[in-house]
Amino acid sequence: MVKCHLSTIMGERRLKIADVSRDTGINRGTITRMYNEEATRVDLDVIESLCTYLKIDIGDLYQVIEEPA
């Protein structure tokens, strides 16, 4: 399972979805789905834009969690 930490990162920085969308040019719906961990696919350019904007590495944004067998 892949866990997205966008909501945690945005919460720590007190960022709003609308502000991130406006500042990055990423569709608000895309950010909302990532924030709520409902996104099933995310374009690499979106990930790159978010990492650049937030000044984080991809490993800070996403984490692979092993599920029990």
Residue ranges and their predicted role:
Residues 1-18:
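A short, Lys/Arg-rich alpha-helix, primarily the initiator
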Residues 10, 21, 51:
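The alpha-helix within a helix-turn-helix
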Residues 22, 36, 63:
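Phosphate-coordinating loops and pocket residues in cytosolic domains that bind phosphorylated ligands
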Residues 26-41:
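Recognition helix of helix-turn-helix/homeodomain-like DNA-binding domains
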Residues 33, 62-69:
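Short, charged recognition helix plus adjacent turn
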Residues 45-60:
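DNA major-groove recognition helix of helix-turn-helix/homeodomain DNA-binding modules
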